[in-house]
Amino acid sequence: MSLHEEILQYSRQDTMKPLSNWFSNLLSESIESGVYGDKNLLEETGQRLVAGIRDYGEKYNINRVAIGMSGGVDSALTAAMFKDAGWSVLGVTMPIHQNPEETDRGIAACETLGIEHKQVDLTKTYDQLLKTFQDHDSTLKDDDQKLRRGNLRVRLRMMTIYNEASRIRGLVASTDNFSELAAGFWTLHGDVGDLAPIQSLSKSWEVPRLAEMFGVPKETVFAKPTDGLGISDGDEAQFGFSYLEFDLVLLRLCQAGVLSTREDCLNFLNVPESDSDHVNKILDRIRMSTFKRTNPYNLTHPIQTNRYTGLNIIDSALW
């Protein structure tokens, strides 16, 4: 199987609408330039990230981590990397009106990877919390408020996982990948954490391929990506484009260097008219999530403008 075909398989693009000619050519160019690396490059990438986890633990004298095991490939790969780095890993499943298959995959990943598992069923807690909020805001139950209700689930899970991390005197792992970071497909003060080993990895190729290499079960590697919140029929249905399409545009733009306007982005990509609407939808997604990546936006002291720089210097000196 060629690398091109492998990427279509691991991104699940081969189960969806075929790539347009422009996207297919962009994939070929991305393979040729090394943006989509082969197995050897991925092995090196994975081992360097594991070394980074190990170095972090040695620097800050910590080696325990709690990870929310959603049943998806991101959390499973994150757990596998921490385990490979020699950390004590607690995988926590936290179902809330969950598809049982997702919870089962989270448990199976813990068993396969040989890490400790704990289940905290938050369904009743969430229902009570939702009722309390609805008593003060009846609109929360409306059909068009799924996103708000979903964010409540995520933040309830984050409270739980941080409590578990505190109990074991460890930290919380962030399981977001680079694609989700750029798309804003995460909740502020929700599904984030203290150390993010896979946040530089693409969802369409590096995450699933590395997950298989690290021993994650195949049913998890190839599971349909969902937010686990019941907001839509999978991540890509919510986006309106596939992860592979998103990553191809994102990673190509990351190579551009200086970009000043949207027009610069489109010109650099050399997007044909037939694909312009699709690419603009991707650019809109990145643009509308910028506020998440800059949160909180810290205003500079109007007189003593170097305070943040000074604090960074102090932090570096003390560590």
Functional labels for PLM-detected ranges:
Residues 2-67, 90, 97-98, 105-124, ...:
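ATP/NTP-dependent adenylation/nucleotidyl-transfer catalytic domains that generate, transfer
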Residues 72:
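Conserved G/P- and acidic residue-centered "switch" motifs that form tight phosphate/ATP-binding loops
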Residues 75, 79, 100-107:
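Short, surface-exposed alpha-helical segments at coil->helix boundaries
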Residues 76-83, 162:
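Short, hydrophobic alpha-helix immediately C-terminal to the catalytic nucleophile
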Residues 77, 128, 181:
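Phosphate- and divalent-cation-binding pockets in alpha/beta enzyme and binding domains
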Residues 84-89:
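Conserved S-adenosyl-L-methionine
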